[in-house]
């Protein structure tokens, strides 16, 4: 049964209001709350003894969505989930994931998940994963997502990962392997506050000729929170890779950004950029002259930066 709290979480992490259109799997407190397959997208449980689902998308599937959100509303729930995606050839699909935790108790609630994508020739996947935590209990809210992607010739993925607010601890691991003419674009947006801690390890291997990879990371660290970023692009052939990390630091927060590029071919073209700084005083002043308070001006700037 979907409660009012559950519905609020689903809207925040997956923009869902009511029953989703198309294929979907809603996981709640380590169980399957609802599931639906379509003619072109099949969702099945993992074999016995392994938690998670298997999503198979038929060749030529275009314009369809698949929603697979996870919500935890009971304090003390911890889980390890494995989701495998098999995308056929010549597809163009949207996959919306995400996890929301409401913890009003004193025990830790944690979701660890491994998503593995096998994207076939000339297929395009848009993948969105949002994380959000709330609740007035003392129990922590923890998420540790691992995403692994294999892109065949001409395949591509646009991946957007967002941590909205309220996650006490997270370790994100992402690895993408690109074949010939494949393309990976990863946009990461992260907000931490209080004493939260976030780590993100990301690696894109450009193995095939004319493979392309881009990482765009934008983060805000407030209060006494800590962030560590380690994006890596490895060029093993004629390829192009670009890493861009921009962070705003506030209060007594700490940010460590360690972008790395490795070229194992003379035809690899790789670029990395990293910047950490505070909000510029002239930006705040300009907004305050328009009638905003300092707090409202800060909030407006941060929303624009993370948009």
Language-model features: locations:
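Conserved beta-strand/loop scaffold segments within soluble protein domains that form the structured core
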Residues: 23-28, 33-285, 289-292, 302-307
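C-terminal functional modules
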Residues: 1-25, 30
């Amino acid at each position: 049964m979907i409660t009012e709290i559950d519905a609020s979480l689903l809207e925040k992490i997956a923009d869902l209001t009511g029953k989703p259109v198309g294929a979907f799997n809603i996981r709640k407190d380590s169980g399957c709350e609802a599931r639906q397959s379509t003619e072109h997208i099949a969702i099945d449980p993992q074999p016995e003894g392994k938690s998670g689902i298997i999503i198979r998308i038929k060749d030529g599937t275009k314009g369809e969505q698949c929603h697979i959100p996870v919500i935890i509303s009971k304090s003390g729930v911890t889980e390890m989930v494995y989701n495998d995606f098999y995308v056929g050839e010549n597809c163009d699909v949207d996959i919306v994931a995400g996890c929301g935790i409401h913890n009003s108790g004193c025990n830790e609630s944690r979701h660890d998940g491994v998503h593995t994508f096998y994207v076939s020739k000339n297929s395009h996947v848009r993948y969105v994963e949002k994380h959000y935590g709330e609740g007035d209990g003392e129990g922590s809210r923890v998420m540790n997502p691992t995403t692994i992607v294999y892109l065949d010739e001409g395949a591509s993925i646009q991946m957007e990962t967002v941590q909205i607010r309220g996650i006490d601890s997270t370790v994100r691991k992402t690895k993408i392997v690109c074949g010939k003419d494949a393309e990976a674009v990863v946009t990461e947006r992260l907000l931490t506050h209080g004493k939260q801690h976030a780590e993100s390890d990301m690696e894109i291997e450009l193995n095939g000729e004319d493979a392309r990879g881009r990482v765009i990371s934008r983060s805000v660290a407030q209060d006494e929170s800590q962030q560590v970023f380690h994006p890596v692009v490895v060029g093993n052939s004629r390829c192009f890779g670009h890493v861009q990390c921009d962070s705003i630091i506030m209060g007594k927060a700490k940010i460590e950004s360690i972008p790395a590029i490795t070229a194992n071919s003379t035809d690899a073209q790789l670029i990395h950029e990293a910047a950490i700084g505070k909000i510029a005083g002239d930006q705040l002043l300009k907004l305050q002259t328009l009638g905003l308070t300092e707090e409202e001006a800060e909030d407006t700037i941060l929303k624009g930066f993370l948009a």
